[in-house]
Structure formats: C-alpha cells, structure tokens
A protein has these predicted regions:
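Intrinsically disordered, glycine/charged-rich N-terminal periplasmic/extracytoplasmic linker segments
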Residues: 1, 14-17, 141
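Sec-dependent N-terminal signal peptides
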Residues: 4-13
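The N-terminal extracellular segments of secreted preproproteins, especially immediately downstream
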Residues: 7, 17, 67-70
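N-terminal helix-cap/turn-to-beta initiation motif at the start of protein domains
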Residues: 16-27
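Exposed loop/turn and edge beta-strand positions of beta-sandwich/beta-sheet ligand-binding modules
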Residues: 22, 38, 135
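Central antiparallel beta-sheet cores of small beta-barrel/beta-sandwich binding domains
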Residues: 25, 30-113
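Edge beta-strand at a domain terminus
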Residues: 123, 129-145
C-alpha cells in the first residue's frame, strides 16, 4: 500500500511542475476585452513555491498612460512597464490555472483570476472577477513567439 501511494505521488508531481512550466518564461500579448485592441506584452515567471506572476514588459498603445494613476498604495503612479499585474496564479491541472489575482491598470482594481491554456499552447483565456466567476470579465491573450 505504501509503495502504491508513493508511486501515485511521484507520478502526479511532474505533471504539476510541467503545467506551471508551460507558462513560466513565456510572453503574451494582452487584448482589451472592451476594444479588442492589443494593450501590452506581459511575461510570466514562476516563484520558488510554483506560483506564477505576470509583469508588463511593453505597453503597445502609444496614447496609453505610462503610469498606473488609478492604482492605490504601492502601485499608485508606478510605471506600467515593470508592473506585476498577475500574482499567485497556480496550476490546478492540465492547462488550468486558478486562485490568482489580476490588477487592471486602467481602473486600479484587483480581481480574482483564473486562466486556461489552449491545447496548442497559443491562447490563454483568463477571467477576472469579484466574488463569483459568473460576474466577471474575460480576455484572451496570445502567445508571442
């Protein structure tokens, strides 16, 4: 019985690590869900605990404000480039990521965040929400080669 349990745990561990690795180090073009226009390039990185974060590397809208003027606290008036907008996103199975948070620099609001990676690894469908997911907003981001 102990051998069976050990083998099950051993087999499950690489799948979890691989799932996080699918996003780790990748760059994505964010698309505004209201205008359908590209907004920024963000890079995902994994911390020592396996949680993923995403940081803005480049703002794609020339007229976009360079600072997070509506953000509060430590993020107030911080440059958008270098701003971490996704935090604590964790792999929860094949191509699924949950329990994260996302900051909308346009409004300064933070939402709960879940995401699903497409089977071909080229699209990331994310949903930001407060309370229940049904009352949130969705965006699809596209992997940059």
């Amino acid at each position: 019985m102990k051998k069976y349990l050990f083998l099950c745990l051993l087999a499950a561990h690489p799948v979890h690590s691989f799932a996080s690795d699918q996003l780790n180090g990748t760059v994505w073009k964010t698309i505004d869900d209201q205008t359908n226009q590209p907004r920024a390039l963000v890079r995902f990185n994994e911390d020592k605990n396996g949680a993923l974060s995403a940081t803005i590397e480049k703002v794609l809208v020339p007229s976009e404000a360079n600072k997070c003027s509506k953000c509060e606290g430590a993020y107030q008036n911080k440059s958008l480039v270098g701003l971490t907008i996704v935090k604590n996103l964790k792999s929860s199975g094949e191509n699924k990521y949950t329990n994260g948070s996302i900051l909308d620099p346009k409004t300064g609001k933070t939402y709960s965040f879940n995401a699903t990676l497409s089977p071909d690894g080229k699209k990331l469908s994310g949903r930001g929400y407060i309370g229940i997911s049904a009352l949130g907003r969705s965006q699809t981001w596209y992997k940059v080669k």
